[in-house]
């Protein structure tokens, strides 16, 4: 939900590049939402799995589940990267027909596809943290993600133009996932459910 809010907040900056960019950005957002569905489902399943194992005192199984989820997400990420590389134009063509829009959107979709692995990692680790009862941190991390996305937009878009609209999301996914991994690694989540 926070990703959707920050994406909406960026719309004002995107609007400054004209209707082609607005349509391209919106189209890439639709495909990103489709890509996020397996990650989101994995996070939900991982949250339940984590809650059960933390409750049973089996913290080692939490790591095993997280590792398995990250590997599955990585496999899906590779699949999406290949699909975007080979069929990105056709994927975008599901939503729009204008070739100028497709060309611009393809640039954004390819940029985003480089960062999908971090998005999958972010969802998986947040799933564990939520399942372990560290939901407040996950909410705070989501707010930080929103703020970072907007900050990067205000820095990148004026400097590099339309590509900055797409890069700010990916860079934010990297930072948010690394902070979440750090939170997991320090083990504070182990004390939340007890």
Task: Kindly give the residue locations of the regions a language model identified.
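Interfacial/gating helices of multi-pass transporter permease domains
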Residues: 14-33, 100-106, 134, 167
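Short helix-kink/termination motifs in transmembrane helices of multi-pass secondary transporters
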Residues: 1-13, 17, 86, 90, ...
């Amino acid at each position: 939900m926070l990703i959707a809010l920050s994406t909406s907040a960026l719309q004002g900056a995107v609007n400054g590049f004209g209707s082609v960019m607005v349509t391209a950005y919106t189209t890439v957002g639709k495909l990103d939402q489709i890509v996020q569905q397996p990650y989101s489902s994995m996070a939900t399943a991982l949250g339940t799995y984590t809650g059960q194992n933390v409750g049973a005192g089996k913290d080692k199984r939490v790591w095993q589940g997280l590792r398995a989820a990250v590997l599955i997400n990585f496999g899906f990420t590779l699949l999406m990267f290949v699909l975007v590389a080979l069929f990105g134009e056709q994927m975008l063509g599901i939503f729009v027909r204008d070739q100028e829009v497709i060309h611009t959107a393809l640039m954004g979709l390819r940029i985003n596809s480089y960062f999908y692995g971090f998005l999958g990692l972010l969802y998986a680790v947040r799933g564990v943290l939520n399942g372990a009862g560290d939901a407040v941190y996950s909410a705070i991390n989501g707010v930080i993600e929103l703020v970072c996305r907007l900050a990067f937009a205000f820095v990148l878009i004026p400097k590099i133009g339309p590509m900055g609209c797409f890069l700010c999301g990916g860079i934010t996914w990297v930072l948010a996932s690394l902070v979440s991994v750090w939170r997991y690694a320090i083990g504070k989540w182990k004390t939340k459910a007890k």
